[in-house]
From Swiss-Prot:
Catalytic activity: ATP + H2O = ADP + phosphate + H(+)
A single GO molecular function term of this UniProt record: ATP binding
Protein name: DEAD-box ATP-dependent RNA helicase 38
Organism: Arabidopsis thaliana (Mouse-ear cress)
Pfam families hit by this protein: DEAD, Helicase_C
Region feature Disordered, mapped onto this chain: 1-91
Chain intervals with Low complexity compositional bias: 7-25
Cross-referenced Gene3D superfamilies: P-loop containing nucleotide triphosphate hydrolases
EC number, as in UniProt: 3.6.4.13
């Protein structure tokens, strides 16, 4: 579809400002009824102001990247357009009529060479008038964040000191990460951004009644954003574009549906012509049907369920006689034998996190853990250290399963399979997001699922395989060094 139709050009405002500003506005969290869940998803905030000098806007040849990573080949993206607006797939960023400032950000700061497949198809849909809504699903690591960040930046008028783009995320970590991407990509534009998440400092004064926000882009979590709107801190009159990152979770009944719908309705009362972008790696049928009823006449991009798992990531399952054997598999087999970059180990409980942490730390690995006993500022510090490669292993509940982007991660271990708290049934969306933490942007990677030989873990794994129509290879003997060597070689984590 997208390769054969004609594109209507968009005019993008360029900026005369010589700086880009980004500030984090924080808010004290109020007591709420604790939600029963295995993970501890909430939010994140590490106050950092990035002010960059605008140098020459010309892009020097030596500053362009020499090569591009192989992205997942989303060859089975199904595109359904609404209306008669023609679109042309963008094979180059030059095809998008972007400002010189944004082009420099893409090439010099982001080190991009060309759009990934999801970017090539979705960006013309986002930027072409009449700016129709978009529901977009694509592989983890395929470049979805760039789609909506570039979409927001391209539609902002830097001369108007009012909020014009809003991005809503389910966690603090994801909001921070999206802010970092926006700061890099928009470094030369003069576009300002503000972070709306709960304060990481316990007892800090609430920021709900502060001065009205004048930043062009606001990125935050739904609870804080809803309060800002209620206290008139966040003006909606000039809002052009609303983004839901991890939209399946934002609009699920057990997620943030009520808050998300209220925000959409409040914006619609003031500015009915705003554009809605919904991005996620997963959309179950219930959420997909709900979105179709809620968002009017959207363009849609979807990937078949069986095509969602990344081919570059090899998945394995290991049946262990006892819990202690899982730790032995991690430290004596996988970590000891493989050529491992960085590793994320997903656990169900804080007790498991502490147990695995202790075992690996005693082996001399640089290990950190993220779980519910930590303050937000401690979580921020740990995630930041991992992203800066100061630590090798991160043990976590599902707080970072969604959207966490660290390209050096090539190993994911499911110490516990993801299941739903209420029913114990497999959480398919969380499994897919976990797998997506390895092999970012087509890099090689491996996922090891550690199962107890009690029947239940095996049943959960079988349901996951059936759901994704995938056969996960089994390591027949949990303590066979040769089998692990063979698996690691196959995954590209051990030289021949």
């Amino acid at each position: 579809m997208a390769d054969t139709v004609e594109k209507v050009p968009t005019v993008v405002e360029s900026s005369s400002s010589s700086t880009v500003e980004a500030s984090n506005s924080a808010e004290k969290t109020e007591p709420t009824t604790e939600k029963k869940k295995w993970g501890d998803v909430e939010d994140d905030d590490d106050e950092e102001e990035a002010v960059s000098e605008l140098n020459s806007l010309s892009i020097k040849e030596e500053e362009k990247p020499d090569s591009i990573l192989e992205e997942p080949e989303d060859s089975n993206i199904k595109a359904v357009t609404s209306g008669d607006t023609p679109y042309t797939s963008a094979s180059r960023f030059e095809d998008l009529n972007l400002s010189p400032e944004l082009m420099k950000g893409l090439y010099v700061e982001m080190k991009f060479e060309k759009p990934s497949k999801i970017q090539a198809i979705s960006l013309p849909m986002i930027m072409t008038p009449p700016h129709k809504h978009l529901i977009a699903q694509a592989h983890n690591g395929s470049g979805k964040t760039t789609c909506f960040v570039l979409g927001m930046l391209s539609r902002v008028d830097p001369t108007l000191r009012e909020p014009q783009a809003l991005c809503i995320c389910p966690t603090r970590e994801l909001a921070n990460q999206n802010m970092e991407v926006l700061q890099k990509m928009g470094k030369f534009t003069g576009i300002t951004a503000e972070l709306a998440v709960p304060d990481s400092t316990r007892g800090a004064p609430a920021a709900t009644r502060g001065a009205p926000v004048s930043a062009h882009v606001v990125i935050g979590t739904p609870g804080t954003l809803k309060k800002w709107m209620a206290f008139k801190r966040l003006g909606l009159n000039h809002l052009k574009i609303l983004v839901f990152d991890e939209a399946d979770h934002m609009l699920a009944t057990d997620g943030f549906r009520d808050d998300s719908l209220k925000i959409m309705k409040d914006i619609g009362r003031v500015n009915p012509n705003f554009q809605v972008l919904l991005f996620s790696a997963t959309f179950n049928e219930t959420v997909k049907d709900f979105v179709a009823r809620t968002v009017k006449d959207p363009n849609q991009l979807f990937v078949k369920r069986e095509d969602l798992a990344l081919d570059s990531v090899k998945q394995y399952k290991v049946v262990c006689p006892k819990e202690q054997n899982k730790i032995e598999v991690i430290k004596d087999q996988i970590m000891e034998l493989g050529d491992i970059g960085q590793t994320i180990i997903f656990v169900k409980t804080k007790a498991s996190a502490q147990k695995v942490h202790k075992a690996l730390a005693e082996m001399g690995y640089d290990v950190t853990s993220v779980h519910g006993n930590l303050t937000e500022s401690d979580r921020d510090k740990i995630v930041k250290e991992f992203k800066e490669c100061l630590t090798q292993v991160l043990i976590a509940t599902d707080v970072i399963a969604r959207g966490f982007d660290q390209q050096r991660v090539n190993l994911v271990v499911n110490y516990n399979l993801p299941t739903k708290y209420e029913t114990g049934e497999p959480d398919y969306e969380v499994y897919l997001h976990r797998v997506g933490r390895a092999g970012r942007f087509g890099r090689k990677g491996a996922v090891f699922n550690l199962l107890l030989d009690d029947g239940w873990d095996k049943e959960v794994m079988e349901k996951i395989e059936k759901y994704f129509e995938a056969n996960v290879k089994e390591i027949k003997s949990w303590n066979s060094e040769e089998e692990y060597k063979s698996a690691l070689k196959e995954a590209g984590l051990l030289d021949e």
